[in-house]
Amino acid sequence: MRVKDTLNLGKTKFKMRGNLPVREAEWQKEWEENKLYEQRLKLNEGKPRFDLHDGPPFANGNIHMGHSLNKISKDIIVRFKNMNGYYAPYVPGWDTHGLPVEQQLAKKGVDRKTMDRAKYRELCRQFAEEQVQKQMADFKRLGVMADWDHPYITLQPKFEAEEIRVFGEMFKKGYIYKGKKPVYWSWSSESTLAEAEVEYHDIKSPRIYVAFPIKDGKGILDSDTSLVIWTTTPWTIPSNVGITVNPKFDYSVVEVNGKKYVIGSQRLSAVAEDLGWEDYKVVKTLKGTDFDRMTYQHPLYDVTGVIMNDTYVTADDGTGLVHNATGFGEDDYNVGRRYGLPVFSPMDAQGRFTKEVPDPDLVGMFYDDANKVVADKLEKAGALLKLSFFTHSYPHDWRTKKPVIYRATTQWFASIDKFRDQILAEIEKANFIPAWGKTRLYNMIKDRGDWVISRQRAWGVPLPIFYAEDDTPIVTPETIEHVAQIFEKEGSNAWYTYTAEELLPEGFKSEHSPNGKFRKETDILDVWFDSGSSWAGVMQERDGLGFPADLYLEGSDQYRGWFNSSLITSVAVTGKAPYKQVLSQGFVLDDKGHKMSKSLGNVISPNDVIKQMGAEIIRLWVAGADTTSDVAVSQDILRQSAESYRKIRNTMRFMLANTSDFDPKEDAIAYPDMSGVDQYMEIKLNRLIEEAIEAYNKFDFNSVYKKVFSFISNDLSAFYLDFAKDILYIDAEDSETRRSMQTVIYDVLVKLTKLMTPILPHTMEEVWGYLKEPEDYVQLANMPEVDHFANEDEVLADWNAFMKVRSDVLKALEKARNAKVIGKSFEAHVTLYPTEETKALLDKLNANIRQILIVSDLTISDEEAPENAEKLPTASIVVEHAAGEVCPRCRRTTTDVGSDPRFPELCARCAAIVAENFPEAEKEGLEK
């Protein structure tokens, strides 16, 4: 008989390698076929609700690592909530309207301007639906559990109808109006943009100082004096109608080179240096209020401008005097309106000057090309004091990446002025993670202007507005509901297939249309109004969902996006915020802090990672990330996640193998009968569960991951399971010490598997298949209960103290290894000269300390430590090579090898175990 045959070597079919790219897909197919999502919800019927509302990603292109971070985070939360006593449905959504779809069709050669609008929109719909299906497959492959058969999509007729009703309610309350004012205008998209659709990039721009001569100085300034302005947009000078000064500032009239100029006193030294004025003198100082309603002459055209007062003028840069073009700036517009100035915006949708511009040379010219022309004309007129160039951050269209301008156009707006305070009060009631999110959103709402909700595009939800014969806009509760019902049945394309009269309620009349003729609005709603209405189209409308949602979770850019638009529409209509909690996450960057881009070659595709490593590795990366700030990802970082995964998997495999002969119903040892170290591990396990569940409840997966991984690495692998081999392999199969340890290991397996299922559902489902538990799937089990024990504080204190003794012994062993006294720790004879405190502790523990320290021999001495002892906090320690021979069965070096004549090759312990449990060994003899 071989010595090996007398050992309890664990067996399991749970493989060392996960083969995740293959096995995950098989698990997902099985879950879908067995309707696990539906099963889980059925189990939870009647339990408290938890509604996480999915912010809809845009349906365009393959998913990226940012999508993975977002969707996996949501999946972890929903899985945890469902396993922890909540009814937690998850309806995934998609945002499908807007410019990106139109851009994709343009790339395919589809021209929206020459095509029937309804047919064009049908092509858009088909493309968007294809993208939804592609992304859905990708999200499923990440292991996300959701109601995939019933997603919400912003192009769905029912959703569009609810969005129309939200608009109608806001209109009825007086929050929607039509006006002409400067808005972000994308000449590349030929449409307005909301603030959330603008991003900033560095560009090189000209900056000029221009002199505007005084025309009527009201007896205070002479006509030989000029106002000096500074601007980075020379192309707006032809549209100048005013100059603004700050009424609280002082202004200096300076004489230089025989000419007089007005400059803000706080800016004088900086401007003089920039203009190279070495010899100038201040001839007069005026208050900003002195300038009010003076006039000046435009340096290029026969146009008289007015000087205005407003505190938006700062002394941070420029001259303290601001050139105003009311059609090309928000502040310009606001101050101009107070002074009764016209809104002058001589530019078309493509950024080209129209014939209204007072300069024939500029008509038809692109605004950016006009910079040089205008500067040259100013120089010829003697009005250009300086031209230079600088690089600065400038707004760009987030889709086309082209610069945008402010341009006054007639648009539909939503104003929050009437209910701003109500929104702010709702923000105060909500919980934000991180906490700074509350301040950020509060300040955005406090300071935000009106929301331009109209767009000059084709693919979107039409603005449900009719115009009478005298151009009066018609929006009534009856027209809104009639259009909503049509959209609900046929979709919003009905707006383009029916006449205005067919879309209006039967017999509809208006005093503004004596002939009964009406026309339809051609603009569509901003896509942020689409997604911002999802609380109505999904959470309020669908059975099984609740309003307000318990949680909105998106990237931190959504404070100005979805968090913002949803809040405005919801408070406008219901008086309540659509969410109780908001969780924001950072952006995914590479390991050097750069954005992912093809040009940098740092793009990591989730689909590529899944093919190479598996979705579990991405899920572990998500769980291990601190998402309160930007999250780094690279091949190296993913390899680290893969290493962590291997550690987890191999630890689970070891525990499965060593409980394969354990039946929890027959073999379990009760807690009071366990050894002290087994009790210690039970207590540590339950403390872990308590802390991890608390972290899950705070959506702090990073802490869950760290705590679980630390427990696996430090408490299990590096400690408990390390010395466990001497019991699991060597002791008799049915010995109480072995069964006690197996009881703990099995408990660890069951509870860790449940605890880690939200993060690693595929792997934990695989582990579950080897356990003897009643649920067919771990996803149908609940989070582990936390067990408490009467003696847990005492046991923890004692064994935590012992771990310090162990740490000192490990240091002494390491030193002895380096000195070549021993090879492996198991060859050592350790003599401890403990402190009184340590001696009392070791006596109290009454444990097999030698076995736990994994050494061959241990002596605890009351004598004084010799000079060569390693003096450490808990004991002085001497490490020597153990005397005797190595037992081939337990590998311990001991002097009692051969003490039992029946088994001369074994130590006394092993001989006794073999004799009792393998009687045939004595007859056959043992072979190594």
Curated annotation (Swiss-Prot):
Q: Which residues bind ATP?
A: 598
One Gene Ontology cellular component annotation held by this UniProt entry: cytosol
The organism encoding this protein is Lactobacillus johnsonii (strain CNCM I-12250 / La1 / NCC 533)
Give the enzyme's main class according to its UniProt record, as a single word: ligase
Q: Where is this motif: 'HIGH' region?
A: 57-67
Q: Which residues are L-isoleucyl-5'-AMP-binding? A: 554
| Stated family | Belongs to the class-I aminoacyl-tRNA synthetase family. IleS type 1 subfamily.
The record's NCBIfam families line, in alphabetical order, gives:
ileS
Q: Does the keyword Membrane apply?
A: no
Motif 'KMSKS' region per record, residues: 595-599
Q: Which GO terms describe its biological process?
A: isoleucyl-tRNA aminoacylation
| PANTHER family documented for this protein | ISOLEUCINE--TRNA LIGASE, MITOCHONDRIAL (PTHR42765:SF1), SOLEUCYL-TRNA SYNTHETASE (PTHR42765)
In the record's own words, the domains note is: IleRS has two distinct active sites: one for aminoacylation and one for editing. The misactivated valine is translocated from the active site to the editing site, which sterically excludes the correctly activated isoleucine. The single editing site contains two valyl binding pockets, one specific for each substrate (Val-AMP or Val-tRNA(Ile)).
Subunit details: Monomer.
Catalysed reaction, written as an equation: tRNA(Ile) + L-isoleucine + ATP = L-isoleucyl-tRNA(Ile) + AMP + diphosphate
The record's GO molecular-function terms, alphabetically, read: aminoacyl-tRNA deacylase activity; ATP binding; isoleucine-tRNA ligase activity; tRNA binding; zinc ion binding
Instruction: List, alphabetically, the Pfam families matched.
Output: Anticodon_1 (PF08264), tRNA-synt_1 (PF00133), zf-FPG_IleRS (PF06827)
Sum up the protein's function in the record's words: Catalyzes the attachment of isoleucine to tRNA(Ile). As IleRS can inadvertently accommodate and process structurally similar amino acids such as valine, to avoid such errors it has two additional distinct tRNA(Ile)-dependent editing activities. One activity is designated as 'pretransfer' editing and involves the hydrolysis of activated Val-AMP. The other activity is designated 'posttransfer' editing and involves deacylation of mischarged Val-tRNA(Ile).
**Which keywords does this Swiss-Prot/TrEMBL entry list?**
Aminoacyl-tRNA synthetase, ATP-binding, Cytoplasm, Ligase, Metal-binding, Nucleotide-binding, Protein biosynthesis, Zinc
This entry's comment on the bound cofactor is:
Binds 1 zinc ion per subunit.
Question: Which Gene3D superfamilies does the annotation name?
Answer: 1.10.730.20, HUPs (3.40.50.620), Ile-tRNA synthetase CP2 domain-like (1.10.10.830), Valyl/Leucyl/Isoleucyl-tRNA synthetase, editing domain (3.90.740.10)
Q: What is its EC number?
A: 6.1.1.5
Q: Write down what this protein is called.
A: Isoleucine--tRNA ligase
Instruction: State which gene encodes it.
Output: ileS
